[in-house]
Structures are given as structure tokens and as C-alpha cells.
Amino acid sequence: MNLKNREIQACTIIDGIQDELKSISLFLHNNPELGQQEVRAVQTISRYMEQHGLDTTVGLTTCPELRTAMRSDIGLDRLHKMAFLGEYDALPELGHGCGHNLIAIMSMGAAIAFSQIARDTWGTTFFGCPAEETIGGKVFMANEGLFKGYDGALIIHPGGENEVGGTSLATHPLEVTFHGRSCHIASLTDSGINALDCAVDLYQSIKMMKQDIFPKEAIVGAIFTQAGTAPNVVTDKATLRMTVRGATVSDLEDIILPAIKAEANRIATSYGATVDMHHYEPLFKDMRQDERLVSLFDEVMTEFGESPRKLPPDEADGSTDVGNVSYEVPTAQPTLNIGNQLEAHTPEFACAAGSTYGLDQAIKGAKIMAVVALRYAESLEV
């Protein structure tokens, strides 16, 4: 069977299961679960993948962060293997305001179709990746080596327009806590050390460093999570929690974060305070989109009537744990329009993720991904 016929057959397979996939997506949409709590989602998806001949494992490795991670495999003894990345965690209050219920069925449909068409020469894995919105399940999956040995990893994200290419920002959230010494604000002994002054000075210093020291792509967002309990008492403990982003892991880990930590230590010393620092979420690496896969998504999305905007390799929008996958295996994550100019993480986007149009677009996305996988597979076999 030639490539064109295999592509047609893959799309026919997805058409044949589209009602079931849409039903699963609506179930996820109507029963949103936060990261690391996606029990019903995993049960539903794993049962369905097993019905289509893929061996499924829930809870990957002994890593506690991967209790709701899963994988569905077939043909892992083949020379080549393709990974399809699914997500299913929701957002607090908004539910599926990032459309992970659609991501799940796009990758499920593509994996099922690819596994049936390419099973003689290719292994297939659907990875269920938990907690993208919080701890980043793929970070831990990559650290555990789960993506090693794959020839490609594919995922499509719903959005407000069609896009291919680009990158994502590296991020490594940081919490800084200053410890001072409490006393009454009117104490004549002047024995207090104001931890809040330290935190405020660090906040102001970061604003200046963004202008003078950091690379231009650096982004730091910060809030005070502890700032004292009474206005007439010198604050003995103050905490600044921040998301810190850079264009690359190198910029972030070698320039931006060391500068912030050094400044925190300098400020603490100048006041006679002490300081504790820790990363409260893991490192999300920048995305290294594979140009071959980007070109194929550009080509196939256009053929399906979804001509994408091609982003420059250095254009970034937010951060994602898919970046960590891209350091391990050739990866691409295009964006498929489910509502013109809609912004993710909004009530409107959550509605679109459960709409008839959103579901129809997800079925189209599954077909696009399956066709890209087949063309990419053939290019590696030549």
C-alpha cells in the first residue's frame, strides 16, 4: 500500500471512532480533574486504548509525581517507535480552559490510527502526561528516561489560531524567604530586622536587573506570599514567590537565576537577615521544535484547510513541559484553531473546548497528526 492510501486509511480509522473520541473528550470536559488527581480521566482513556489493542500501564516508574501518568504501547520491539503525547489535567475554577480534553483525543486518535497502519515496521506509544499546568508531568517522564529510543514525539495544542514552529520559554519558579528579627515597631532598642524590607528591596532590584542585566527575553512575575501579620510589629519573615523565565535553559540557569540569588544573598547580608531559596516547581526547558516535523505539520495542516502561521524559531509564548521532551527526541507542537483569537485560560476558551466546533477540530487534529506521523515515518525508512 502506497503512502497516500495509508494516509486515507488512517483518516478512515479516525472517522470510524470519532463519536467515541468526542464522547471521551466531553466526559473529560464535564468532569475536570486537577493535575495529579486525574483518576477518572486515566481510567477512561486506558480502557479505551486497551480496546484498540494497545497494552496500557497506569502509574509510570516509582516516581510519585507520575501516579496518574500512563502509557499505551504496541510493537515496542520494532526498529522505529513513534510517541503521541496526551494531556488531561484541568485548571482550578476554569475546568478545561486550556483544552486538554481535546489534546487527549487528538493524540489518542492519531496513535490508534498509526498503530494499525504502521504496525509492521513501527512501534506506537500513547503517553498520558499528567499535571502540565502545575508540576509538569513530562519533566519527570523525561527525567525517568521514558522518551528515550523514540524517533519522534507529536502533540497538537488547541488555540485561537493555527500556528507551527516557534519555541517556548524556559522557566524555573523560585521562592525566596527572608528571616529577620521581630520587635515592636516603636521599640527604643531598635533591635528588629525587617524581613519585609529585604523582600521589597529584592523586588525592586529585580525590576532594575530586568532593564540592565537580564537578557531581553527574561520575564519575572512575583507576589508576596508572606509579609507580616501586624503593622505595629517588625516583620520577621517575608516570602517572595516568583516565576522566572528566559529564552533558553542556559540564559535562565546561568545568568538570570544566579543574578537573582546573588542579589537576595547580598540584601540579606546588608540587613543582617538570613535567606532561604528553593524552586517550588521543576525546570521547564525551552522548546526545540524539530524542523522536519514543523515542515510536515505546515504542509499537512494546509492540505486540511488549516493554513498555519509559521513562527520564527525564536518566537516564544509561555512555557510548557513539552520543552523537556524536545531535549530527548525530535518533537513538534503546533497550534490548531478552535475559535478565532480566543485566549487560553479563559472561560470562553473552556466553552470552546467543549463545543461542537472544538470537537470537530480535534478530530481533524487527530487526522493531521496521523498523516504527519506516516509521512515522517516514511522519510526515516527511505
Locations of the language-model features?
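Acidic/His- and Gly-rich active-site-bordering loop/insert found
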Residues: 2-122
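Metal-dependent amide/peptide-bond hydrolase catalytic core
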Residues: 200-382
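A short small-residue
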Residues: 2-4, 23-27, 88-92, 178-186, ...
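Buried hydrophobic packing segments
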Residues: 45, 106-114, 137, 199-206, ...
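Hydrophobic/aromatic beta-strand patches that form the interior of the parallel beta-sheet core
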Residues: 82, 127, 152-154, 330-334
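Hydrophobic face of alpha-helices
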Residues: 14, 18-21, 42-46, 107, ...
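Histidine/acidic-residue-rich, glycine-tolerant segments that coordinate divalent metal ions
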Residues: 68-74, 89-97, 101-105, 119-235, ...
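Short coil-to-beta-strand
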Residues: 78-84, 170-177, 236, 332-334
